[in-house]
Curated annotation (Swiss-Prot):
Known role: Responsible for glycerol-3-phosphate uptake.
Parts of the chain on the Cytoplasmic side: 1-36, 85-93, 142-160, 208-261, 309-321, 369-387, 436-444
PROSITE patterns in UniProt: GLPT, MFS
Record flagged with keyword Transport: yes
GO molecular function: glucose 6-phosphate:phosphate antiporter activity; glycerol-3-phosphate transmembrane transporter activity
Protein name stated in the entry: Glycerol-3-phosphate transporter
SUPFAM superfamilies assigned to the protein according to its UniProt record, in alphabetical order: MFS general substrate transporter (SSF103473)
Amino acid sequence: MLNIFKPAPHIERLDDSKMDAAYKRLRLQVFIGIFIGYAGYYLLRKNFAFAIPYLQEQGFSKTELGLVLAAVSIAYGFSKFIMGMVSDRCNPRYFLATGLFLSAIVNILFVSMPWVTSSVTIMFIFMFINGWFQGMGWPPCGRTMAHWFSISERGTKMSIWNVAHNIGGGILAPLVTLGIAMFVTWKSVFFFPAIIAIIISFLIVLLVRDTPQSCGLPPIEEYRNDYPKHAFKNQEKELTTKEILFQYVLNNKFLWYIAFANVFVYFVRYGVVDWAPTYLTEAKGFSPEDSRWSYFLYEYAGIPGTILCGWISDRFFKSRRAPAGVLFMAGVFIAVLVYWLNPAGNPLVDNIALISIGFLIYGPVMLIGLQAIDLAPKKAAGTAAGLTGFFGYIGGSAFANAIMGFVVDRFNWNGGFIMLISSCILAIVFLALTWNTGKRAEHV
């Protein structure tokens, strides 16, 4: 491992007179760093979808391009788990920045060499590599949150950070439009967001810090006098990969429950959003332009919903994440039913249902990652979150992309929505199995 990636060493503590001001300043600085950084990752995760119409003009089919699109999700799922283990033994300041920088380079190379976009196989390989580097984003952010924010405030703070998903994903469409207008080529779908991402990668290095102790500050639990009821022993000790995997992650049944819950939450998330333009135009009579606006509203509805969900889990459920997740998934169940059963010709109801799904679904998405952090020691936070992410993207996102299309082709939209409704129910069941975990949970 290169020295630059090693966890930053602890240094001598600051004087008590300087500690409070330094802690407040650095917490805000680090939070801004991982917020901007993760939003930057999203600029390079969904941009391929905007290139599909242009690549179709070159003779590629939807099936071929859908396979390339799935490469990102497949690679991301594996990478989030594997790179999560690596990130637990790395300095997130450089790990997060490196992943974004390398993802940007892949995007630039994708359109810099004409032979890349001449073959589905080569495009798949490049997007797989891009997805792998994308997996270096969430785990170091999760590790950073675990070190700089204590458990009783983490739900609210994490929900605010999670809005970076929506900011990065939502701003991509206008950035793509601007890039095409400026450079007069569809290839700007890749290189224009990549240039911005490279700039962001340097901002990450400027803003993010590893642990409070590496800045001369006490652990966050000591600073806020906010200790988990059943804290892990020696949680500031660096752990080996074997200890992380076999002592704290793979043998924790609650992590497995939320990993399975994540499969069904992600299936609903991507089964709705990735197919919304097609469903609205084919089944509900929307124009393509109107369906894009509906997509935009779906994404940005997730911002207040995510923040509210995190706040509820802290304020009303005392840092237990499952009750809030169950509550929001029950709401998703109702909204998906309305979205499905509302007759064509009622666009207002369709949009309200879609906005409601967006408002509600991102809360459970955020809470599962947060709950994984809560259920593991701080030094195993990246691996724990990586396990749930692996299940979400391999079992949920990639499955939604591939299976939804297959089912709709053979059983029409009713078949697809039966799968979405079933996924809502199964997500609720698996979340309910972790009802009392979180602040009150004991390690199993």
